[in-house]
Amino acid sequence: MIKVVFMGTPDFSVPVLRRLIEDGYEVVGVVTQPDRPVGRKKVLTPTPVKVEAEKHGIPVLQPLKIREKDEYEKVLALEPDLIVTAAFGQIVPNEILEAPKYGCINVHASLLPELRGGAPIHYAIMEGKEKTGITIMYMVEKLDAGDILTQVEVEIEERETTGSLFDKLSEAGAHLLSKTVPLLIQGKLEPIKQNEEEVTFAYNIKREQEKIDWTKTGEEVYNHIRGLNPWPVAYTTLAGQVVKVWWGEKVPITEPAEAGTIVAIEEDGFVVATSNETGVKITELQPSGKKRMSCSQFLRGTKPEIGTKLGENA
């Protein structure tokens, strides 16, 4: 039986681990990030992958730094024939990459060489792409730069969010892995080098990227809102207060107006001007310190005026 070590951390990784177990591989260990304090009460919480591994009685390693000798030697002691990673969250050292008979492979949520990095799902939507996908490739020490083994495309729908695409890609990754591993073991795959001239990056989202830039086009603002839903959530400011914007709709604007100003107030939301003739009607938001709500609920208690400017005094 093929002995596999799985390395992964978030919800995205769980279907991949589950599929390895279902397909009959001997998962001799799981490597995941350390437990983290979560929520206002800072409750120490295990990763989704750790929770899944413990359901199946699989030993779990949680190195703070996998590159340290005493940590990676614990992985090597498991003597895996194959290592599979999916959103593990640390750069894996060569000592591990070179050890397994069948190598180390990674399930990455983009069509490499596009969108290398930790936030490919967010960026696919924020950049307005109509398709993305899964790549399974050999791992190297350089970020997401290994030779490609298999790929599958996944369509991005007009109203797709990072949350819905995350779920689709997670399942697509598990399915593609199920088809890829037997071919890899049988030596039937021809690795393809990535074209370095076509590389783009999707680095982890920073706080300053979450703010809506109303001077962009309506399409770009709409994609920004979708791409940060349900986490970390786009925001703007209204009357000096931070407001998270959970959802909006593209609407035509007939009269020119300064980007970021409210140009219409309707029953289900208010329309904000952008840099072109497409405005964005905010329909779901979350004022600072309050719960997420529909804009119609918000408008029952707060009455912004037409001409009010959003995005100031953040």
UniProtKB/Swiss-Prot annotation:
Family annotation (PROSITE patterns): GART
Binding-site residues, (6S)-5,6,7,8-tetrahydrofolate: 110-113
Enzyme class, broadest EC rank: transferase
One GO term describing the cellular component: cytosol
Protein origin, superkingdom: Bacteria
GO molecular function ontology, one term from the record: methionyl-tRNA formyltransferase activity
PANTHER family hit by this protein: METHIONYL-TRNA FORMYLTRANSFERASE, METHIONYL-TRNA FORMYLTRANSFERASE, MITOCHONDRIAL
Family of this protein: Belongs to the Fmt family.
Record protein name field: Methionyl-tRNA formyltransferase
